[in-house]
């Protein structure tokens, strides 16, 4: 029995970046042998074991043979005769198909180290085309390593394009699409996930709602980039510089989804795109089974972002109503996420923008939350009268703040 460190841990060691987790491959062993050594089996479709002390994953070396369409259509062989090279051959990219033995020697049958040096994301073999999830994984790795200068190899992009044309992506299940997309939202350059899918025509199949934004014009006075798809990616990029939270980044990306539904004759204006966007976001989240917290934040940002931007033009009563509608008084941290997504929208154009709306909204909220029911209960207010009195008191707070703010702006 021989044990090898494999995959991402080897890749990241060679890149000199922190190793998040270690995966191991066991060659020349049986499930029974590992169980005798107190490893605990956790794999359902093929033998994966947890080390009795480190709890790291140890998988028996295996080969995979395509037997049916889709992610689960594989027959696995994990017999003792499977070699390390055969196990590495089934992996997606050469940079993920390297191993190290217990002495630290590199085993690299598919030139992964060379591709690391050349900063290429290249498929190991034509077997790449057997698994549609790999298109998503390549896009995710593009988002992870873009800041290091990595790019997708031309032949790999062509293979991905061929998979799209052959309809292989139709076999993707919603959970896997969202799993890879969500992971990409946590990376340094989440916009590269979308760009990579678009470059091989996969975005049209996987995320048609976002793909439809490309080619839709925006008013030039507000968006120098003009194209709504480009603007959405710029907003996503800006949000990734403001927040590491994938919820915020998701909301920033889809905030203008409704503009894809604007009739051509109305371009470049998009009246009502906010509410139209909420419908499309709900449908997208239902289709891909995206968690409710992502959906709810994205819907709120889509609906409210224009009013957030033009706070100085709103009446105090409208401002308080907006804060009530987004539950800002009970959930100020949620409102903070909304503000970040809106700030990303404003700053995405690349101009030197000072988004003072964030400061103003925070000042308004901090004063309004000081208005509590107890103040009015001791005065004898009851029931709905308490709620109305609190509302009016908050409106008065906003009036004072706006008066002071506008006088300072002069």
UniProtKB/Swiss-Prot annotation:
Keywords for this protein: ATP-binding, Hydrolase, Magnesium, Metal-binding, Multifunctional enzyme, Nickel, Nucleotide-binding, Nucleotidyltransferase, RNA repair, RNA-binding, Transferase, tRNA processing
Biological process annotations from GO: RNA repair; tRNA 3'-terminal CCA addition
Cofactor(s) listed: Mg(2+); Ni(2+)
InterPro entries linked: CCA_bact, HD/PDEase_dom, HD_domain, NT_sf, PolA_pol_head_dom, PolyA_RNA-bd, tRNA_CCA-adding_enzyme
SUPFAM superfamilies associated with the record: Nucleotidyltransferase, Poly A polymerase C-terminal region-like
Keyword presence, Transferase: yes
UniProt-listed Enzyme Commission number(s): 2.7.7.72, 3.1.3.-, 3.1.4.-
GO molecular function: ATP binding; CCA tRNA nucleotidyltransferase activity; cyclic-nucleotide phosphodiesterase activity; magnesium ion binding; phosphatase activity; tRNA binding
Pfam families for the chain: HD, PolyA_pol, PolyA_pol_RNAbd
Catalytic activity, as annotated: a tRNA precursor + 2 CTP + ATP = a tRNA with a 3' CCA end + 3 diphosphate; a tRNA with a 3' CCA end + 2 CTP + ATP = a tRNA with a 3' CCACCA end + 3 diphosphate
Note, other: A single active site specifically recognizes both ATP and CTP and is responsible for their addition.
The protein's name in its UniProt record: Multifunctional CCA protein
């Amino acid at each position: 029995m021989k044990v090898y460190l494999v995959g991402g841990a080897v890749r990241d060691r060679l890149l000199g970046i922190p190793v998040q987790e270690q995966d191991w491959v066991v060659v020349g062993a049986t499930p029974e042998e590992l169980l005798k050594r107190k490893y605990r089996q956790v794999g359902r479709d093929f033998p994966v074991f947890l080390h009795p002390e480190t709890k790291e994953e140890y998988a028996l070396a295996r080969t995979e043979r395509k037997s049916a369409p889709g992610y689960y259509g594989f027959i696995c062989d994990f017999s003792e005769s499977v070699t390390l090279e055969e196990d590495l051959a089934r992996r997606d990219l050469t940079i993920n198909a390297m191993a190290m033995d217990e002495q630290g020697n590199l085993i690299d049958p598919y030139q992964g180290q060379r591709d690391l040096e050349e900063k290429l994301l290249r498929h190991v073999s034509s077997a790449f085309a057997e698994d549609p999830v790999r298109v998503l994984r390549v896009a995710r790795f593009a988002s992870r390593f873009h800041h290091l200068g990595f790019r997708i190899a031309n032949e790999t992009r062509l293979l991905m394009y061929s998979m799209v044309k052959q309809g292989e992506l139709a076999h993707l299940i919603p959970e896997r699409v969202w799993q890879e997309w969500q992971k990409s939202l946590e990376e340094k350059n989440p916009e590269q996930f979308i760009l990579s899918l678009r470059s091989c025509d996969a975005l049209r199949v996987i995320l048609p709602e976002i793909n439809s934004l490309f080619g839709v014009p925006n008013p030039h006075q507000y968006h120098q980039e003009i194209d709504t798809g480009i603007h959405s990616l710029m907003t996503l990029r800006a949000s990734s510089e403001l927040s590491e939270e994938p919820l915020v980044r998701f909301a920033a990306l889809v905030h203008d989804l409704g503009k894809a539904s604007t009739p051509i004759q109305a371009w470049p204006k998009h009246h009502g795109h906010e509410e139209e966007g909420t419908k499309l976001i709900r449908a997208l989240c239902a289709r891909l089974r995206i968690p409710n917290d992502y959906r709810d934040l994205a819907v709120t940002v889509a609906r409210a972002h224009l009013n957030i931007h033009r706070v100085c033009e709103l009446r105090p009563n409208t401002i308080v109503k907006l804060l009530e509608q987004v539950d800002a008084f009970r959930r100020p941290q949620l409102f903070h996420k909304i503000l970040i997504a809106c700030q990303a929208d404003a700053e995405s154009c690349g101009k030197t923008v000072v988004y003072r709306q964030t400061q103003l909204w925070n000042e308004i909220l901090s004063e309004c939350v000081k208005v509590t029911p107890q103040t009015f209960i001791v005065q004898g207010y009851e029931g709905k009268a308490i709620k109305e009195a609190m509302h009016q008191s908050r409106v008065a707070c906003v009036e004072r703040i706006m008066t002071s703010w506008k006088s300072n702006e002069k």
